Structure formats: C-alpha cells, structure tokens
Amino acid sequence: MRTPFIAGNWKMNKNPKETQEFLDGVKGKLPDASKVETVIGAPAIDLTTLVAGAEGTPLKTAAENCYFEDEGAFTGETSPKALKEMNVDYVIIGHSERRGYFHETDEDINKKAKAIFKNNLLPIICCGESLAQREAGQTEDWVASQIEAALAGLSADQVKVSVLAYEPIWAIGTGKTATADQAQEVVAHIRATVEKLYNKDTADAVRILYGGSVKPANVKELMAKPDIDGGLVGGASMDPESFIALANYQD
C-alpha cells in the first residue's frame, strides 16, 4: 500500500521569518506520517528554519534543487552532501522551471538523482509536457523518455523509494488543471514505463504525484484515482490553512 504524499513546492517564495510563521500555523494540524506523508520544499535560505521547525512533527523537508557534485568551485550551487548534513529529507529535481529557465538536461537530472542517493537523500523527480506537445499527441512518449533518462543507472530498490511527479507544463501556475482523468491517464503511463524499465513490484511501490494547480477544491477528486498517490502543490502550499486542508483531504 502506497502512503499518500502531499508535497508543497514554495519555489522562490518566503523568507526564514515567513517560514517560521508557516510552521507555527500548521503545528499540530498535520496527519500522522503513516496516514499521509507531508513535505515542504523550500528555498535554500529557508531550509535551516524549516528543518529545525519540522523536527518532532510529521512534516518532512525538501530542497528545491541540488548540484550533482558534493563540493567544489561551483558558485551558487547547493551541495547534496550539505543538505544531508542539515537533515533535509528530499530534493526536488527536474522541475519544468529548472529545465526551462536554467536549461537543465535529462542528463543533469540523472546525475543529480545519483548524487541524491549517494548522500542518502531521496529524490522527487518531475516530468511533464508542454501544451504544444500535448496537442501534437506526444505526451506519453515525451514523459516516458524523461522518466527513462532520469532513472538511468538507478537500481529497482532506489526507484521504489523515489517519488515521481507528473506536472503538465501548461497547468503550472496557469489556473488550468488537467482533469483528474487526464492526470490519471499520464500517471498510469508513467507507472507502466517504470514496470517496463524494472518490474511490476517496483512500479507498484513507487509513488507518483500530480502537480499543476492542485488545491483543496480538487485534491479529493485527484486522490480518488488509482495511480495518483499525491500532489506536488505550488501556490496552495504556501498558506498554512490551505496546506492543512490538502494534507487532511481524507477527513
């Protein structure tokens, strides 16, 4: 049984003071981690505050990116080794904003995935198509190729504990949402891709999220789909009340 997974991605928002206010706002109101795993992905400058505040609570923490080297002359990059030493749990990689604005390639994302595992962290690996690709009927091939490239060289055991996230680029921050049926269709295809690359056990174990304008109003419908295990949530994860509602969608 895959534990549901509700993850916030704050992107380039909130300072440490606002992070502490958020933590105070959700304290004691998140479900037990055995029921729903809750995670907040925050900018690097907020992670010290986030990790300290999440300690002893069900909330887990994620960095929004890291580099594939542990240390060195890489000005402005975030070390996965340092993230582990800070007690961060997850790292989000392959987000369409990283691919689009910062020209990250499938090869970069694969190197990052390996560096994350080398440092005993866990990846949240994103994939998704543009509107042009969807309209051209290329969604399934494109998403499968992104997943295959990201997972190259990872063991089945590593993939089982990874989290994958389907984020159609046309539905991120646009207010457009893939219907629950559209999301389920692509997420099922991602699971089938994992089965083809590995085996059924691995495909049944890996958690796959949907991201793209997920909010309290649509989370229940998305979570009712058999292959959707959670949400990677942008804007709706920044408000404590909204995040609490998402996390407690089962109630």
From Swiss-Prot:
Q: Give the Enzyme Commission number.
A: 5.3.1.1
User: What is the active site of this protein?
Assistant: H95 (electrophile), E167 (proton acceptor)
SUPFAM superfamilies, A to Z: Triosephosphate isomerase (TIM) (SSF51351)
Q: Where in the cell is it found?
A: Cytoplasm
User: For this chain's UniProt record, which GO biological process terms are given?
Assistant: gluconeogenesis; glyceraldehyde-3-phosphate biosynthetic process; glycerol catabolic process; glycolytic process
Which EC class is this protein assigned? isomerase
Alphabetized, the UniProt keywords read:
Cytoplasm, Gluconeogenesis, Glycolysis, Isomerase
Which pathway does the protein contribute to? Carbohydrate biosynthesis; gluconeogenesis; Carbohydrate degradation; glycolysis; D-glyceraldehyde 3-phosphate from glycerone phosphate: step 1/1
One Gene Ontology cellular component term attached to this UniProt record is: cytosol
Residues noted as binding substrate in the record, renumbered to the chain: N9, W10, K11, G173, S213, G234, G235
Cytoplasm as UniProt keyword: yes
Q: What GO molecular-function term can you cite, just one? A: triose-phosphate isomerase activity
Please name the Gene3D superfamilies in this protein's record. Aldolase class I (3.20.20.70)
Q: Which InterPro entries match?
A: Aldolase_TIM (IPR013785), TIM_sf (IPR035990), TrioseP_Isoase_bac/euk (IPR022896), Triosephosphate_isomerase (IPR000652), Triosephosphate_isomerase_AS (IPR020861)
Highest taxon above the source species: Bacteria
Q: Which reaction does it catalyse?
A: D-glyceraldehyde 3-phosphate = dihydroxyacetone phosphate
Q: Which Pfam families match?
A: TIM
Q: How does it assemble?
A: Homodimer.
Q: Which family does it belong to?
A: Belongs to the triosephosphate isomerase family.
Q: What this chain does, per the record?
A: Involved in the gluconeogenesis. Catalyzes stereospecifically the conversion of dihydroxyacetone phosphate (DHAP) to D-glyceraldehyde-3-phosphate (G3P).
Q: What is this protein called?
A: Triosephosphate isomerase
Tell me which species this is from: Lacticaseibacillus paracasei (strain ATCC 334 / BCRC 17002 / CCUG 31169 / CIP 107868 / KCTC 3260 / NRRL B-441) (Lactobacillus paracasei)
